[in-house]
C-alpha cells in the first residue's frame, strides 16, 4: 500500500521483484497527498491501476485476505499509524515491510522512529545499511534491515535503441518540491536551462514536473517551476512535461537535477548527467550522497551543456551493488518462517499519542473534509487573535 506518487512507484517496482509465484495486490491509501489518476498511471507503468482505498477499506481487505506480508510504502506518520493502529488487529499478524523510495543518505532518526514498528526496513545501498545500522543501534527498536537494488534500476537500453525511431535529443531537468527552496535559486535554474536551449537549438530542453498544477505530491512545492517561468515572462525555449521518468530518459542525451533520485535512473540508463552544487552540497539539499561521485557541477556547466559519468568506486558503494548482494527477499523469508517477536515501536506511549491521532485523521477522514477543517481552523484562529 502506498500513499503518494513516489512511494507508489517504489512499491509497484518492489512487488515486481518478488518471486513469480507470490500473489501480489497493490492499493493506494486515501490521504491528503493521494496521487491523481495520471500520476497513478505513470507510477505503475503497464501494470493494472490500483484502487484508492480508505483506511477502513484497507483494514477490511487485510482481514478478509489475511496476507502473509504487507508492504507499507508510505510517508513516516502514515506508516506508524497504519501498523500501530489501523492494521494492528489483523490476524494472523502479517510481516510488515517498509522502506524509503529513493536516496536515504544521510540516514535520519526520524525515518527510523516512524518505521520502528515494522519487521523489515528495506534500504538500497551498502552505505545506507551502515548508516541505518548505526541509527538502529543507537535508538533501539525496529526490525531487520534488508538490502535491495532500487527496484526501478533495470540497466541501460540496448545500444542503438531509438524509441519510435527518434534520436536522443532531450535534456531532462528533474524537479523536486523541497530543493532548492528559494524562489531566486529556482529562477536561476530555469534561466540556465533557457541559455542551454538558446545555445543548442538541436536539443529539446524539458522541465520534468513531478505534478501538474493542482496535483498533489509527496512534499508540497512552494514555488512551482511552471508558475515561476510564467512570472519571468517565459524568456526562452523550455518545455514543461509530466509523465513517466522512464519515458523521458529513453530519449535523453543529458540529465540535470539538484538531488533527485531520478539521477540514479539516469546513471542506470547510461545518460550523462549533472548534479548542481551551486546551492550547496549538504543534508539539507539532499545531495550529500553525490559528494565524490564526479557528477557535481554548476549552472554554468548546465548552460554550456556539460554532463558527466559517475566514478566507478562511488557507483559500487551507492545503489549499484551486484544483485546477488541484495538480502531483503531472504530476510523476508526468514521472518515468514521464524518465530521472531514483533518489533517494538519507539513511538508507543503517551508522549507521541497526539501526533498519532493527527496521523489517524489523515488516513480516516476524506481529504476534502480534512482540508475544509484545516481552513476553518485557520480562519477561527485569525478571528480570535
Residue spans for each PLM region:
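Structural loop-to-beta junction motif characteristic of Rossmann-like glycosyltransferase folds
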Residues: 254, 270-277
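Conserved catalytic-core segment of nucleotide-activated headgroup transferases in glycan assembly
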Residues: 10, 153-226
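N-terminal pre-catalytic "stem/leader" segment of glycosyltransferase-like enzymes
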Residues: 1-69, 381-385
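C-terminal amphipathic helix plus adjacent low-complexity
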Residues: 287, 296, 300-385
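Donor nucleotide-activated moiety binding/catalytic core segment of transferases
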Residues: 218-268
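Extended catalytic core of nucleotide-activated donor transferases of GT-like folds
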Residues: 38-115
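Short internal beta-strands
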Residues: 23-33, 122-125, 206-210
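Active-site-proximal region of nucleotide-activated glycan assembly enzymes
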Residues: 90-147, 153-154
